[in-house]
């Protein structure tokens, strides 16, 4: 049994402006685990994702975020990324004028520099990334396109998964990855996420619906309400929520 804790959140209070959004939140995740976070709109799910990644709009007023036993509560988002924390956004942004090849190479080489490794030149990187692309069922012409510009919903999500694979993230936080996907695209994305899962990395899935969890089975499901985790259960929790709604947890 693995007793090592990858992510440990202790008594976290978070505000934005004068509004408190997270309240004394606790969460611990071991390597190799998949955790799903569910809850109604406005329950704090996406806020939690952004706070773990270090979004500057949110202020932590109490508590700690430990990643591999290192306190990352106050460190910059890019440093958290270098340590192995990856956030896939619900709505990935377009970056006109920047090709995927350039964007991915810069991100990858920044990670290598942090790890005290030599950067890859463009030719070496292209050979490296082509293998990653084929594993995620993307055409190599994808590299010459601008980041997310004119992409379908499925292509944007595949791009996020490619970044997750490229950076070899230890903790991937996927914020409503199923949003806007038809069933075929959802199955494809889920298959790719499952293929990247190892006993050394962990995944947080943030979702409203059971359908994503039909294809990616979580070890634990946490339900959030008003900035708190009010319930933690097994993978069958999603089916109960689908059948009875969130209110049954308050009965």
Curated annotation (Swiss-Prot):
**Keyword Nucleotide-binding belongs to the record:** yes
Q: Give the species.
A: Antithamnion sp. (Red alga)
Entry protein name: Probable ATP-dependent transporter ycf16
Chain residues that bind ATP: 39-46
List the molecular function annotations (GO) for this entry. Answer: ATP binding; ATP hydrolysis activity
Query: In the UniProt record, which is one GO cellular component term?
Result: chloroplast
Q: Does the keyword ATP-binding apply?
A: yes
Report which superkingdom the organism of origin falls in.
Eukaryota
Which InterPro entries does the entry mention? Answer: AAA+_ATPase, ABC_transporter-like_ATP-bd, ABC_transporter-like_CS, FeS-cluster_ATPase_SufC, P-loop_NTPase
What is its subcellular localisation? Answer: Plastid, Chloroplast
What gene is this protein translated from? Answer: ycf16
The similarity comment for this entry is:
Belongs to the ABC transporter superfamily. Ycf16 family.
Q: Where is it mostly found? A: plastid
**Keywords, comma-separated and alphabetical:** ATP-binding, Chloroplast, Nucleotide-binding, Plastid, Transport
